[in-house]
Structures are given as C-alpha cells and as structure tokens.
Amino acid sequence: MDVLRNNQAGLSGLAQLQALMVANSPPPINETMGFVLIEIEEGRAVFEGNPDRSVYNPIGSVHGGYAATLLDSACGCAVHSKLAADQGYTTLELKVAYHRPLTEASGPVRAEGRILSIGRRAAFAEATLTDRDGRLCASATSTLLVFPLERPATTA
C-alpha cells in the first residue's frame, strides 16, 4: 500500500485499508510476520496470523514481539480507519499483557483492535489476541498520535 499515493488520491483511512484488502497487497511487515488484515470497518480492524517456528524464542514458544506486532497493527489500523485522507498516525505507547503462551499449534490467531476514543491529536485503542479456540492469549492498550500529513510539493 502506498499511503502517500492514496493520500494524494484523497482516500480516507478506511478507503485506503479497504483498497489494501482488495488489492491483496499487504505492507512488507505483514509478509515478514505472516499475518493479514481480514476485516476492516470504521473504528475496528482484525488481523489473522499463523505463527510458526520462525517466530519462536529460545524457550520454544512464539516470541512476545510477534503478539505485540499483531496487537499494534490492530490498534493502529482501527485508528487509521477513522482518519481523513490528510491525516496520519503513529504509536506513542503500547502496553501489552501476555495471558498465555503461543505456539504454532495456537494458530490461526486473531488480533482485533477497537478505538476507545479519538481526538484531533491523540487516539486511544485496545486489542485482543485470541488463539484458534478463542482463548485470550494477549491484550494491549495503545496511545497514538494523530497528525496532519504533508502534501508533496507539486512541480510545474
């Protein structure tokens, strides 16, 4: 997804994320970590992933960073879905609680993010990560900065 191009086209955050899903063109982080955006609506985003041994830590379970990345993506895209074409966001803080370990047998896993509140400069979101049986594996709260996107200079 080329956010800058979509911004120039005047697409809202929700329209940008919907276009990403239709084009089946995930950002590189999704390919690297093996997860995909499967649902998007205003204020809500759902990702699905299949953790495998490539994301294991030294003790034989999925590294916490995998769960944190999914939760951060779910929170961020929930916020992105409510932004105008001329707005961007970035995570300021992510607090993750790990409830149970993940292994490759846990998948597919599902991260669902929701907006708690959004203002002109800050947004607050939460997300849950559940395993194939619907058990809570991790949860997160996030504070995100909302900012205006600069328009690229046009050439004459």
Question: Where are the regions a protein language model picked out?
Answer:
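Terminal targeting signals and extreme-terminal segments of soluble enzymes
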Residues: M1-A156
